[in-house]
Amino acid sequence: MAVCPHEWLLYCRPGFEKDLSAELADKTAHAGQGGYPIAARDSGHVRFVLDPETPANEVHRALPLEALVFARQSLVAFPPLEALPRDDRLSAIVDLVVASGWSFESIWQETPDTNEEKALAGLMKALRKPLESTLKKRGALRRKAGGRRLHLFWTAGDRVQLAMSFPGNRAEHLGGIPRLKFPREAPSRSTLKLEEAWHVFVPREAWPTRLSDSMQAADLGAAPGGWTYQLVRKGMYVYAIDNGPMDDALMASGQVEHLCEDGFVWQPPMRLDWLVCDIVDKPMRVIDMVERWLVAPWCHEAIFNLKLPMKKRWDEVSRCLERLASSLDQAGIRARIRCRHLYHDREEVTVHVCLLD
């Protein structure tokens, strides 16, 4: 009989393990799933140990990655293999894979997003070819296996956790970290937050219709123009709302109208396609402002950041999202709301709202 996995392995930004653990405990309880988190501070990951009668695959499907806020990656996993002998790390790994009955098309070796674990790169490189060769011979690594992927999550030279991911419910980047290149002409590094948000929230095949050069957008709290830069690069006409100065090159594009007004008060002259906002303020005040825009409605889609408190961050995020969803529901507005702690976020989360009517 095959050995069944009963752990859920999730990656996160180091320092946010407690927040991810709180989110998982809350959401599994609502889903009627039993279990508990194991997380060390600044470790960059959380192990959620499920009840013995609860298959990890069931929870993984019930709470997909796109429904989670603080997770970068979501995997079905076995408990870690520990105290691996330095002269033979492969045997225990291969034995567990064979016992699981797993088959897969690719193998990823990963570490937490910390400087200490990144030193394991040499070990992973040395193991890659012999690991692939052995698993091919044992019939686990195949050309066709439903797109499944084996993950080896190394947290020490003698400690690795084996996990599996499935297409459509995983991040397609090593460590769950997208590799975006900072455009030198952008006015600030914040530009990468909006670019990453589009990759996460808007399917690439929908970009021609939802991020097109025929659109109009508002950027609240725009200066110096990091987010406006992304809108302009897509060909949009942008109302940049901020009392601060905008980047000269952006203004020279002819696609930006800079208005020195309060982003919480300004109203657009017509319904726009996009609202984006990276204003540093109390999260609930930002929610109230976005709610007004969506109820009016002054936009079709919105992406905005919520700055988080130092403690009980999941409680604050949950409260804000519930408030927004409830307000839109009471107004009879159908919308899809998603939220993610992006790689390029720090002490904030990014929210996307798409009106469905």
UniProtKB/Swiss-Prot annotation:
Catalytic activity line of the entry: cytidine(2498) in 23S rRNA + S-adenosyl-L-methionine = 2'-O-methylcytidine(2498) in 23S rRNA + S-adenosyl-L-homocysteine + H(+)
GO biological process terms on file: methylation; rRNA processing
Enzyme Commission numbers on file: 2.1.1.186
Keyword Metal-binding: no
Subcellular location, principal: cytoplasm
GO terms for cellular component: cytoplasm
Gene3D superfamilies: 3.30.2300.20, 3.30.70.2810, Vaccinia Virus protein VP39
Domain of life per record: Bacteria
Primary enzyme class: transferase
Residue numbers binding S-adenosyl-L-methionine: S190, A223, P224, G225, G226, D242, D262, D278
Transmembrane segments: none
MF term (GO), any: S-adenosylmethionine-dependent methyltransferase activity
Active-site residues, as the UniProt record annotates them: K307
Localization terms from the record: Cytoplasm
Keywords (A to Z) from UniProt: Cytoplasm, Methyltransferase, rRNA processing, S-adenosyl-L-methionine, Transferase
Quaternary structure (record): Monomer.
NCBIfam families documented for this protein: PRK11760.1
Known function: Catalyzes the 2'-O-methylation at nucleotide C2498 in 23S rRNA.
Family, per entry: Belongs to the class I-like SAM-binding methyltransferase superfamily. RNA methyltransferase RlmE family. RlmM subfamily.
Matches recorded under PANTHER family: RIBOSOMAL RNA LARGE SUBUNIT METHYLTRANSFERASE M (PTHR37524), RIBOSOMAL RNA METHYLTRANSFERASE FTSJ DOMAIN-CONTAINING PROTEIN (PTHR37524:SF2)
Official protein name in the record: Ribosomal RNA large subunit methyltransferase M
